Amino acid sequence: GDFFGFIDRTESGGAKDSYFEASPRLSFAGVSGKDIQFGIVKDVLVSTTWEGGEGFNNYLYGFGVDLDIPYFQYANVNFYRANNENTADDYQMTIAYAVPFKVSSEDFLVDGFLDWSTAEKDHASELNWTTQYKWNVGKHISPETRLYLGVEHSVWNNKFGIKGSDENNVSALIKYHF
């Protein structure tokens, strides 16, 4: 299995807010000790996510598959049932991916995710597709350092399930991978 998590902290107009996600996944191949690869599927996993912020906790559970796609560092698809604290429960699909490549002696990485959730009686379907385009300047510090400079492009339709609340943003990015 694996684990992905992050915390965002924002401060605006004197208000301080935090949002986090913790996403542990349990590998059937890892638990069983058996190779369960078939076709492009490398593994099948139990997928969970805890989303939390000011005044809410959402719990997502379901299954995922890790895919073996040429040139991809990783590609996975997760299917969840979402128990939402403040809105009607829904379903979510999350795709995550990374494609490393070189230009001359420089290392680059394109990675990102796509979250799509279903519409329910009190909210619209939403789609958040965020991709980061990064250059590893860290290797000029040491071969193992992963310090990236780049840009992030985020397209978010019906943000927070609000119909017509759409964003299309490009941000500068400095990111360190542990």
Outline where the language-model segments fall.
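Alpha-helical membrane segments in multi-pass integral membrane proteins
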Residues: 89-135
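Outer-membrane beta-barrel "beta-signal"
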Residues: 166-178
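Glycine/small-residue-rich interface belts in oligomeric ring/scaffold proteins
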Residues: 1-25
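Transmembrane beta-strands of outer-membrane beta-barrel pores
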Residues: 3-11, 46-54, 79-85, 99, ...
